[in-house]
């Protein structure tokens, strides 16, 4: 699965 929180920096 993919968590869009990874894109948040």
From Swiss-Prot:
It comes from the Eukaryota. Nacreous layer of shell. This is Uncharacterized protein SMPP9. It comes from Nautilus macromphalus (Bellybutton nautilus). The lineage of its organism: Eukaryota, Metazoa, Spiralia, Lophotrochozoa, Mollusca.
């Amino acid at each position: 699965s993919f968590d869009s929180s990874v894109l948040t920096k």
